[in-house]
Amino acid sequence: MNVYFTHSCRCAHSWVQALQAEGFVVKMFEPETLKPARAALHTPASLNGCHVAEFMGYFIEGHAPAVALRRLATEHPAGTGIAMLSPASKAEGGVDGPVVLVDQEGISHAWIGEPQR
């Protein structure tokens, strides 16, 4: 897994540590801007946070938990990536908020949990 974050990002390291504790191998990169990574991964601008990751060809926005990454690895769903829709502080460990799967058209679909109404 590759994680791209900017100098101003204060949360990527804690998310990476949580994933490493779950057995994931993670490389971290600190480019000047995330635009090239996001363009390559086709990340919708509406989901952009302070870091983005690439896992098995999918983009990951937000602090997606290990369970979501394992599900991606097992199911290989049609789509370009997933995004965690809850604040980072709630996303450590289990799934406290919904995770959406983004399709080829950039449309988000409920994937894990239910979006808050």
Give the predicted meaning of each segment.
Residues 10, 35, 91:
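Flexible, glycine-rich phosphate/dinucleotide-binding loops
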Residues 40-117:
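Thiol/selenol-based redox catalytic cores and closely related redox-interacting motifs
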Residues 15, 33, 65-69:
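Stable alpha-helical elements in mature extracytoplasmic
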Residues 5-8, 27, 42:
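Charged, low-complexity surface patches
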Residues 16-36:
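Conserved helix-turn-beta segment immediately C-terminal to the redox Cys motif
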Residues 1-22:
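Local sequence-structure signature of Cys/Sec-based thiol-disulfide redox active-site neighborhoods
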